[in-house]
Amino acid sequence: MEEKVAIVSSGYFPIPAVQGGAVESLIEQIINQNEQENKIALTVYSCFNAEAEKISGAYQNTKVKYIAIPGVVQSLDKAIYWFAKNILKKKKHMSYRYIAQRLYYIDGVSKDLKRESYDRVVIENHMTLFGTLKNNGNEIKYRGKYYYHAHNVITADYGYLNVFKNCKAIVSVSNYIANEMKKTYGVEAPEEKFRVLLNRVNEKRFKNVTDEDVRSWRNKLHLDDNDRTVVFTGRLNPEKGIKELMLAFNEANIDNCKLVIVGSYYFQNGLKSEYEEELEKISESAKDRIIFTGFVDYKEMPALYKMADVVVLPSIWNDPAPLTVIEAITVGKPLITTCSGGIPEYATPDVAEIVPYSENFVGDLTVALRKVMGDESYREKLARNAQKKSALWTEKSYYYDFLNVIDIDELEER
């Protein structure tokens, strides 16, 4: 009999990942593979989105349960966000964007967990989601059956530390995050409770890109035939190092080269941050050498990676396990990145030019850009090694690794 597994997603963005989101994309991978392998009876909790619901209607082996957020809750969130940004002048005002929605979502999921009976429950990446277990007697009901999947460092426990400690296992996206989780847990942290599930991407999606797909994007971006491209992908947040990359790119002054910045501050919701406005000012000095695409649908990303001569992902914080790094390697592209957080567990020196973060980071990044863009044989070597490294990075292996870390012993059929 199939095990009944529930995944509780963030409640911020819908499943499948029609509005983007790294965690949402990983959940979608598990769904896609379960549709083929059908090893578990999978249920995923998500906030409602009409497009996502339409896609999920075709699933045969997975049920997505949507929590529809009332208009009054959405309006309340907009008011809270406006107050935090404009009156309180909060620097991290985006953390106030979905407070009411999350509380409503947690309540809805908690009530449904009480009605249902699952063999495994996986809480995805935010301590507040433990409210789904603490309420309605679910912590006792699912004791020994629930897991926490950590994609980031925990910055606050929101009163749920004991619920967190009672997890059957704490699954992390890198050893870096696993070590941080142990610090949160405390000195008594039992080693067997901590497990690592390395991130993956849909390798078919990222490797099956046609020349026509690439030409289409080059035309959209008005690139000349002799233009080479440095590509950055991701949210335009300060910790991603995009400002430093733009400054380094301007300083490097590489002939016939454009910097293509793919992404926006907060996915597809139209918000523009003060930081984005600052980036636009920096780009003015580069004239047409720096191109902003804005939000790009995730299904279009493989062509943009394929278009790149080099991908640069210069995180200046302890990035746990950025999917953008994994995507670039999976496509087989030369990579420039940093040795921050969990990045070195994915991007090793044989596939990437590693730039240490220091006071002279912009200068060091400038040198790295000139080195990689100026040496075609070096770029080809990095690309070949990336293709070899990613050969075993498959959606199927991610699915079976996921089953194993939640104590469902299934061997991958190769």
Where are these regions (language model features)?
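Nucleotide-activated donor-binding/catalytic signature segment of Leloir-type glycosyltransferases, i.e.
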Residues: 139, 273-296
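Conserved donor-binding/catalytic core segment of Leloir-type glycosyltransferases
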Residues: 171, 224-240, 246-249, 260
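A short helix/loop element that forms part of the nucleotide-sugar donor recognition site in Leloir-type
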Residues: 207-223
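Glycosyltransferase donor-sugar binding loop
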Residues: 258-277
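Short alpha-helical donor nucleotide-sugar binding micro-motif in glycosyltransferases
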Residues: 295, 304-308
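Short hydrophobic beta-strand element within catalytic cores of glycosyltransferases
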Residues: 330, 334-337
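A short, well-ordered alpha-helix in the C-terminal region of glycosyltransferases
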Residues: 371, 378-392, 404
